């Protein structure tokens, strides 16, 4: 009888201690100013000095390469399995969903996704079920020093060069220092005027800004395209977005527009463009985007964005024609589409592909007019030269060649579903499902 009583007392004490610990954790979360939400924690938010925004505003475009070693954590980092549970730093760490806390010492803890943790274990040749201790890492750890930002060749900003070298070692990639300071790199041509003196930027300076930004967007695009699932993970609301209206420019320019357009309204306001204004001494960057706003409504539409960059480059038709001639060499490839250029090097309104017998209408930059492609000669009497006609006050539908066939299939399925819903609405009267 005494043994049974002792066992009951021990169980009751253990249950009480667990209840008190749970209550203390809940009270700590409620007592915090952020309500236990790590997205509201100041350490996760951007600062005024880095992005010129108010403290307490979540910046979706902060450089994730530098975020708490999420991307750079590897099983090779020290891991002490004999940590005192009372001093476990993970007790103070709030990880998001699908992530686990890994304690490296008494003061360092990082949140690692389950998938990334398993992937890193496989790369290291260690089964996560058999992991019993640290793995020797060949990547040199960086000391704590005063930040000296550098821009890497992958388009990301690093707090100092050692961080860049460590990131390259962990990822097994070749990353070099492109310039000192934040990305994008400034032009090589020094400015002789004072930084406080506002002046008008020349066309040559606008072209340099456009080329520099285009190179930066390309580096970011190529770096982000290595993981095709990133687009789906980072843009969960894309399925609610009308994909029939997309930037008419392709590749990195259209990709960057979609990344900046955080509210999916096909317009870039000043808060969305502010992520690009990283170099305070570069006066022509903001002036360049101001020149893109042809409607002067403080908004840049998808078409204004594309044409603003396109008009700052060499004549597009002549450039494409020269590239085709270089690829062909002496031999002329059968079935090759040859663009028709005007005397200024821009595209003629009517373009035809003789091998397939189709013609279509384009603007002077080669952007195809939706619905104009037919078998035979197209009637392209309208002048599609743009100087703000398709700006933020006027939407036009364009197709995006980068969309996958699955996306096109999904769009067709959605159209069929909409038709069925319309039929149901006609039969059901005034019933609504809550969507407009």
From Swiss-Prot:
Subcellular location: Secreted, Extracellular space, Extracellular matrix
Taxonomy, superkingdom: Eukaryota
Pfam families per UniProt: Kazal_2 (PF07648), SPARC_Ca_bdg (PF10591), Thyroglobulin_1 (PF00086)
Keyword Endoplasmic reticulum: no
Modification after translation (UniProt): Contains chondroitin sulfate and heparan sulfate O-linked oligosaccharides.
Record-annotated Kazal-like domain positions: 133-185
DNA-binding in keyword set: no
Record field: compositional bias (Acidic residues): 399-430
Signal sequence, start to end: 1-22
GO cellular component term of the entry, any: extracellular space
Sorted UniProt keywords: Calcium, Disulfide bond, Extracellular matrix, Glycoprotein, Heparan sulfate, Metalloenzyme inhibitor, Metalloprotease inhibitor, Protease inhibitor, Proteoglycan, Secreted, Signal
Protein name, entry field: Testican-3
Name of encoding gene: SPOCK3
């Amino acid at each position: 009888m005494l043994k049974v009583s002792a066992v009951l007392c021990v169980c009751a004490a253990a249950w009480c201690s667990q209840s008190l610990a749970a209550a203390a954790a809940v009270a700590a979360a409620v007592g915090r100013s952020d309500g236990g939400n790590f997205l509201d924690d100041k350490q996760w938010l951007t600062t005024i000095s880095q992005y010129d925004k108010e403290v307490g505003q979540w910046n979706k475009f902060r450089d994730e390469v530098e975020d708490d070693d999420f991307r750079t954590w590897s099983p090779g980092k020290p891991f002490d399995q004999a940590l005192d549970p009372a001093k476990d730093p993970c007790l103070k760490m709030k990880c998001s969903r699908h992530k686990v806390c890994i304690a490296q010492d008494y003061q360092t803890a990082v949140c690692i996704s389950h998938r990334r943790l398993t992937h890193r274990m496989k790369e290291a040749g260690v089964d996560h079920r058999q992991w019993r201790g640290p793995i020797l890492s060949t990547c040199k750890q960086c000391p704590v020093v005063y930040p000296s930002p550098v821009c890497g060749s992958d388009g990301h900003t690093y707090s100092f060069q050692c961080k860049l070298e460590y990131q390259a070692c962990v990822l097994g990639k070749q990353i070099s220092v492109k310039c000192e300071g934040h990305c994008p790199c400034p032009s090589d041509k020094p400015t002789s005027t004072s930084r406080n003196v506002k002046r008008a930027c020349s066309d040559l300076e606008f072209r340099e800004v456009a080329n520099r930004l285009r190179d930066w967007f390309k580096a970011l695009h190529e770096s982000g395209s290595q993981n095709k699932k990133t687009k789906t993970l980072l843009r969960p609301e894309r399925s609610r977005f009308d994909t029939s209206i997309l930037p008419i420019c392709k590749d990195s320019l259209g990709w960057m527009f979609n990344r900046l357009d955080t509210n999916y309204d096909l317009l870039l306001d000043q808060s969305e463009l502010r992520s690009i204004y990283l170099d305070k001494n570069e006066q022509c960057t903001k002036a360049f985007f101001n020149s893109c706003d042809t409607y002067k409504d403080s908004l840049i539409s998808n078409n204004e964005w594309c044409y603003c960059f396109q008009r700052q480059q060499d004549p597009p038709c002549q450039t494409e024609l020269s590239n085709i001639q270089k690829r062909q060499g002496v031999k002329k490839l059968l079935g090759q589409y040859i663009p028709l250029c005007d005397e200024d090097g821009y595209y003629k309104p009517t373009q035809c592909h003789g091998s397939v017998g189709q013609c279509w209408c384009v603007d002077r930059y080669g952007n195809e007019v939706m619905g104009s492609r037919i078998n035979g000669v197209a009637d392209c009497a309208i002048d599609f030269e743009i100087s703000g006609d398709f700006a933020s006050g006027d939407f036009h539908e364009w197709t995006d060649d980068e969309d996958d066939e699955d996306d096109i299939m999904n769009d067709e399925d959605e159209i069929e579903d909409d038709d069925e819903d319309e039929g149901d609405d006609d039969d059901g009267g005034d019933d609504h499902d809550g969507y407009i």
